[in-house]
């Protein structure tokens, strides 16, 4: 069930804390619309939920567990703009006071990070806050100034121009 998923490997947690966590990440109202609410059975790997709903439920689980370290790999990949906004809001709650390693192509996902590390060909080429990386006008600035929501949306020829890679193959 959704409840079992949220409290997975957590002992002695009250239902009230589960509801508080679900509300904090914005998934409670959705759960309450389901016929069996928190007792709704989930299919294998949550197949009967959208990607965004699965993300939000996993965020609620991390809050219930009081996880101190969070690892997110493309938390906002393969979702629509509305769901991305929900997840961005949930991330603010989830990451507050926690250490996080966030792998992201969408700049909005990492904008509020204490430190952003920019990799190119597996090497660190920049690291700082969003504001300082913008001021430094390096690769991060170039990519963000293109106003793409995702690095994946940027055509290869533009990336090659920004990074100075040769256009010929």
Model region roles, listed by residue range:
Residues 70-74:
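Catalytic Walker B motif of ABC-type/P-loop ATPase nucleotide-binding domains
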Residues 59, 103:
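Hydrophobic anchor residue at the start of the ABC signature
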Residues 24, 33-37, 89, 111-169:
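C-terminal portion of ABC ATPase nucleotide-binding domains
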Residues 81-82:
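Helix N-cap at the start of a conserved alpha-helix in ABC-type nucleotide-binding domains
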Residues 3-44, 88, 97:
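ABC ATPase nucleotide-binding domain helical subdomain, centered on the C-loop/LSGGQ "ABC signature"
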Residues 86-94, 106:
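Conserved helical "switch/dimer-interface" subregion of ABC/ABC-like ATPase nucleotide-binding domains
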Residues 65, 96:
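Conserved signature/switch motifs of ABC ATPase nucleotide-binding domains
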